[in-house]
């Protein structure tokens, strides 16, 4: 897709009049409002009706139902009573000629979205009007043509390619299985042919369009609404691997309106997808956290149950039976629904479109919990979903803290009673909330999560400066446990029961207060390798709200590069830095165990108390571990649980210290210093008493990769030992240190990696297969040594 030049935009207010079809539809009504945001632009809407008054009434009624309410300048809207199936669009000769001579562009938004209708019905509505509209576009003055198509034309089955915006020849009709997609393909072909004859046009391919990002108001008959209603009613959802790149309707409308002002010759195509998609299983989890009771079950079991229930005349999925049940020989007996699972079809590539939208300052709202909550809330208000059984707490607004909250805190932290805080503003950011905190936030609200703020700070004798901080609102322990139990129950009743009945889970119990205490440690070695801690803000419910230095995204190597194989200099900086932190409590185990904030640590007693939980986690993770790292790894977790009494005392016989216990690239950054990168570790809520090698083992699994992992690990293991010796002033025997690394690998496999497998069921952990393979390579290297 060629990018327009800087001066190739139509200046606002210079277009006179455009024609819009489909203005009474879900997207069309929003597109009308978006077009009217352009000053002085007039919009002629072609609307079906008995007469002009009837057509006008239909449009007025549709606009009146928009939420949030809008008040478009209707003096710039002309309603044309017409018919798209007529070769002259149902207009009189005079009205047709006037339209030909007065409009600058045509926006064809009308159409039928139906995932189960036969092609002949869809062709009549989605393809039939194109010849008449294209004749109108070519007649009289030069006009631009804008076709609202669908991203579904890019889903070719079988296929695995990413279809770029300009790859029209790659779209093969015989590989499009969905009749709706075939009808959109046919419409696009007509536009493509017209462009070959000199027409300037744009094709807009949105993904599935969901509710308004502000109100959640959605299309009552779309497939998403029907699917959610069915799963809530059945209390079952299919375990399928669907990527949900849905876009809110208001974003799609604004994007089309903005992109359509680009001036160009020929054809431009845009893919409108959500850059922050969710997965189907994550949506099901969110519904459970919202208060519904839905279990993920194998697709075949769900389909069998649906076959029984869909006989009811008013079942929400009854109109879509063909989509879910009809098996197609040409795709190995899959249903149309199954062809949309990840990996079975090609997918649209939106990188060029996303770049252009970013240049225009347009960002698609993430398909996150707040957006889903608004959409579900609107469905409940509209009677399309029942209210959930459990009421949720209302989230505090992100701007819930102001100058009066920050000023006394910063005065105390910086030791300056004269300090003044100016205007405080929340800062939008991509959330880095931990998975468990995200779950608690979804279930309980209460502002749980990471929020960023910017403020001006004036100090006597110094220049006023801008300060950016992070406010980390912590979930309470019962909230964290409740969220994890809910997630487990979606997948396995036995796993949920194990979480619910384990009185204290080592590492999780007391996590909120523990992180606060760790940040407050008065030790220069820790402070050098952690963000600055300013203190806590008071909360009405005694919920900790930690205020920390904002490191900025530039420092997050993991965020820039992804969690992948790293350069040796950064790995070494992480190893030496965490050794400094390990030195703080190294050799002081008894003293550390007396600290009230430590909670239940990883002792043999605590591990045995949670044995049933470890067993259920190992069993749950076994299929995934076997698929990713081989059958020999799959049963190892369960055997480690059975032999806890034999090998865990070996851990307790070695020197231990305070460890991060979640030490991977998602939880640390690097500061740039003249001496090179310096570690800055955050998110200390899982900190516990353990082997220092445990943090090293997790780090290496994430950053080495399986190839030559053992060879490289030996160097970093020795580097860690020597750094800890220097920092603690204690001699560490090399053989015992090496043996402790093997024990740490076992600990990692037992207590942490299965939790990632659980989260992977809902939010894809792309790193996990590689981490498992690296773990296995390290374990084999350690055993061979």
Model-derived features: positions:
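Active-site activation/catalytic loop segments of kinase-like enzymes and analogous catalytic loops
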Residues: 686-728, 747-766
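Conserved Rossmann-fold NAD(P)-dependent oxidoreductase catalytic core, especially the SDR/UDP-sugar
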Residues: 101, 105-109, 116-124, 128-179, ...
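Conserved ATP-binding subdomain of kinase catalytic cores across diverse folds
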Residues: 450, 456, 461-608, 692-693
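Amphipathic terminal alpha-helices
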Residues: 1-2, 17, 40, 44-47, ...
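N-terminal Rossmann/SDR dinucleotide-binding element
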Residues: 1-109, 119, 471
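Mid/C-terminal beta-alpha module of Rossmann-like enzyme folds, strongest
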Residues: 259-333
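ATP-dependent phospho-/nucleotidyl transfer catalytic cores
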Residues: 555-660, 671-674, 770, 780-781
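Active-site Tyr-X1-5-Lys
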Residues: 173-205
């Amino acid at each position: 897709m060629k990018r327009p030049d800087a001066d190739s935009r139509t200046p606002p207010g210079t277009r006179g009049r455009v024609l819009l079809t489909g203005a009474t539809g879900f997207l069309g009504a929003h597109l009308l409002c978006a077009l009217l945001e352009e000053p002085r632009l007039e919009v002629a809407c072609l609307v079906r009706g008995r007469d002009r008054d009837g057509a006008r009434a239909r449009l007025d009624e549709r606009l009146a139902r928009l939420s949030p309410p809008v008040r478009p300048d209707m003096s710039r809207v002309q309603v044309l009573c017409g018919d798209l199936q007529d070769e002259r669009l149902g207009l009189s000769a005079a009205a047709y000629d006037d339209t030909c001579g007065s409009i600058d562009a045509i926006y064809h938004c009308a159409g039928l979205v139906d995932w189960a209708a036969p092609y002949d019905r869809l062709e009549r509505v989605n393809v039939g009007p194109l010849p008449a509209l294209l004749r109108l576009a070519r007649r009289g003055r030069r006009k631009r043509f804008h076709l609202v198509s669908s991203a579904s034309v890019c889903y070719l089955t079988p296929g695995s390619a990413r279809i770029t915006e300009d790859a029209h020849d790659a779209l093969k009709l015989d590989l499009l299985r969905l009749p709706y997609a075939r009808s959109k393909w046919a419409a696009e072909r007509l536009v493509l042919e017209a462009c070959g004859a000199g027409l300037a046009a744009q094709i807009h391919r949105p993904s599935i369009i969901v509710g308004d990002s502000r109100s959640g108001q959605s299309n009552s008959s779309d497939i998403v609404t029907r699917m959610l209603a069915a799963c809530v009613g059945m209390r079952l959802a299919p375990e399928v691997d669907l990527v949900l790149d849905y876009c809110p309707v208001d974003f799609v409308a604004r994007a089309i309106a903005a992109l359509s002002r680009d001036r160009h010759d020929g054809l431009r195509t845009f893919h409108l997808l959500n850059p922050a998609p969710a997965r189907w299983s994550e949506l099901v989890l969110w519904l459970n956290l919202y208060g519904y009771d839905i279990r993920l079950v194998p697709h075949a079991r769900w389909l069998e149950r649906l076959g029984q229930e869909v006989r009811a005349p008013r079942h929400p999925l009854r109109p879509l039976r063909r989509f879910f049940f009809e098996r197609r020989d040409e795709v190995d007996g899959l249903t149309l629904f199954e062809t949309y699972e990840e990996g079975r079809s090609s997918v649209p590539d939106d990188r060029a479109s996303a770049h252009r939208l970013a240049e225009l300052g347009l960002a698609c709202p993430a398909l996150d919990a707040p957006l889903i909550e608004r959409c579900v809330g609107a469905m409940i208000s509209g009677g399309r979903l029942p209210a959930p059984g459990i009421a949720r707490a209302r989230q505090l607004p992100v701007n819930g803290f102001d100058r009066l909250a920050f000023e006394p805190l910063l005065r105390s932290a910086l030791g300056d009673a004269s300090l003044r805080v100016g205007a405080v503003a929340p800062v939008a950011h991509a959330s880095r909330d931990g998975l468990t905190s995200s779950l608690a936030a979804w279930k309980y609200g209460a502002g749980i999560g990471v929020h960023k703020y910017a403020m001006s700070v004036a100090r006597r004798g110094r220049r006023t400066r801008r300060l950016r901080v992070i406010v980390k609102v912590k979930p309470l322990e019962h909230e964290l446990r409740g969220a994890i139990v809910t997630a487990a129950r979606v997948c396995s009743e036995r796993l949920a029961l194990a979480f619910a009945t384990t009185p204290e889970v080592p590492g999780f119990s007391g996590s909120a207060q523990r992180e606060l205490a760790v940040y407050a440690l008065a030790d220069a070695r820790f402070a050098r390798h952690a963000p600055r801690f300013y203190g806590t803000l008071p909360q009405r419910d005694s919920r900790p709200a930690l205020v920390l230095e904002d490191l900025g995204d530039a420092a997050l190597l993991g965020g820039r590069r992804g969690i992948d194989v790293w350069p040796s200099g950064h790995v070494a900086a992480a190893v030496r830095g965490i050794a400094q932190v390990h030195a703080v409590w190294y050799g002081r185990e008894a003293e550390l165990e007396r600290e009230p904030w430590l909670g239940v640590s990883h002792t043999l007693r605590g591990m045995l108390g949670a044995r049933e939980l470890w067993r259920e986690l190992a069993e749950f993770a076994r299929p995934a571990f076997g698929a990713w790292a081989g059958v020999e790894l799959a049963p190892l977790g369960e055997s480690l649980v059975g032999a806890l009494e034999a090998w865990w005392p070996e851990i307790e016989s070695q020197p231990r210290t305070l460890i991060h216990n979640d030490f991977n690239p998602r939880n640390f950054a690097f500061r740039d210093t003249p001496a090179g990168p310096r570690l800055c570790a955050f998110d200390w809520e899982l900190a516990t008493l353990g082997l220092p090698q445990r943090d090293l083992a997790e780090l290496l699994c994430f950053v080495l990769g399986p190839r030559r992992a053992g060879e490289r690990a030996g160097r970093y293991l020795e580097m860690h030992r020597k750094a800890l010796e220097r920092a603690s002033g204690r001699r560490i025997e090399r053989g015992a240190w090496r043996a402790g690394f093997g024990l740490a690998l076992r600990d990692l496999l037992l207590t942490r990696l299965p939790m990632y497998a659980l989260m992977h069921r809902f939010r894809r952990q792309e790193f996990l297969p590689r981490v498992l393979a690296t773990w296995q390579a390290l374990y084999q290297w350690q055993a061979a040594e």
